[in-house]
Design a protein with these regions (language model features):
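Charged, terminal alpha-helix-loop-beta segments
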Residues: 1-305
Length: 305
């Protein structure tokens, strides 16, 4: 069991890892921490009816419009879990109408997600306190995108510290095979979906943000999907440049309402569903450098220095 040393200005506190007491507590913690699955809209939990085998307990839709099969286990898991989640993925591919019905029943769902119900893409997420590294070899051999995510917990009085570790196939030099249906979100892709001139401006602003990140020496990676470009540190998104339509796009920041008054720039609007502020970008008029205080705030909020 791992120890965590929490060093403050006055003292160093040694914390023991605090395993989750039950599957229910583990699930409650995962779904109660919105940052962990912020790119996924949950359709329903525990949808299994009767004793039907092969139907997953937790299903969601991500910002790419992919069906997400989420498997939570409050125990160490190894490669033996792969056949089970593959069965779930096959069910999702062959029963899109069942998932579509659940999606349409949602009262609150993002309007900008495009889902191909005729030929859906499926993504698998396996979440557990500990995942055997041997699972990586099996994951890279199957034709579905798979995320292996470890979550451990430490407790100090009323505070919880969560360690989130997304296992990567590069860790031990495993040969990476292309995943079936995995899209490449480049300039050509966006031009096939959006206004071509707007796409050029979209990438111009992304380049300007990347220059700021480089000058500040921030540890952020640029990640594209169908709806936005995210600047991420590991598992967490610091900020985004997001499409609002075929022509318009915006800077997006997850900032508490009470803190937005600290900044001189007025947001265009607040997204109540996603709890984030949207600042529309006017090509040629919006200056990226004016948003540096917002970039800094959001980077520090995910633990950046």
């Amino acid at each position: 069991m791992a120890n965590l040393f929490w060093k403050t200005k006055n003292k160093t506190i040694s914390l023991l890892e605090s395993p989750f007491k039950s599957e229910e507590e583990f699930e409650k913690t995962v779904f109660g921490t919105s940052e962990l699955l912020e790119e996924i809209t949950l359709i329903k939990r525990q949808i299994r009816g009767g004793n039907k085998a092969g139907i997953p307990d937790i299903i969601g839709i991500d910002t790419d419009g992919s069906i997400c099969i989420i498997e939570l286990k409050n125990k160490s898991v190894d490669a033996s879990i792969i056949p089970q989640v593959l069965e779930y993925a096959i069910w999702a591919e062959t029963n899109p109408d069942s998932i579509k019905s659940l999606w349409l029943e949602l009262n609150e769902k993002p309007e900008d997600v495009e889902i191909n119900w005729e030929n859906p893409e499926v993504r698998i997420l396996i979440i557990a306190p500990s995942i055997s590294r041997s699972s990586l070899e099996f994951v890279q051999r199957i034709n579905y995108p798979v995320d292996l995510i470890e979550i451990k917990r430490w407790i100090e009085l009323d505070n919880q510290i969560l360690m989130v570790n997304k296992l990567e196939t590069e860790e031990k030099g495993y040969r990476i095979r292309p995943v079936k249906g995995l899209r490449i979100y480049d300039e050509d892709y966006y031009k096939s979906k959006r206004n071509k001139t707007s796409v050029v401006h979209f990438f111009k602003y992304i380049s300007e943000v990347e220059k700021i990140i480089k000058s500040k020496r921030w540890n952020l990676d640029t990640k594209f999907n169908a709806q936005y470009c995210a600047f991420k540190s590991g598992f967490f998104i610091a900020f985004r440049v997001k499409w609002l339509g075929t022509k318009s796009f915006a800077f997006v920041y997850k900032i508490p309402k009470k803190d937005i008054k600290k900044f001189k720039i007025t947001p265009t609007r607040y997204d109540e569903l996603r709890k984030e502020f949207i600042f529309n970008i006017e090509s040629g008029k919006t200056h990226t450098k004016d948003f540096i205080p917002l970039f800094e705030y959001c980077y520090k909020s995910i633990g950046g220095n």
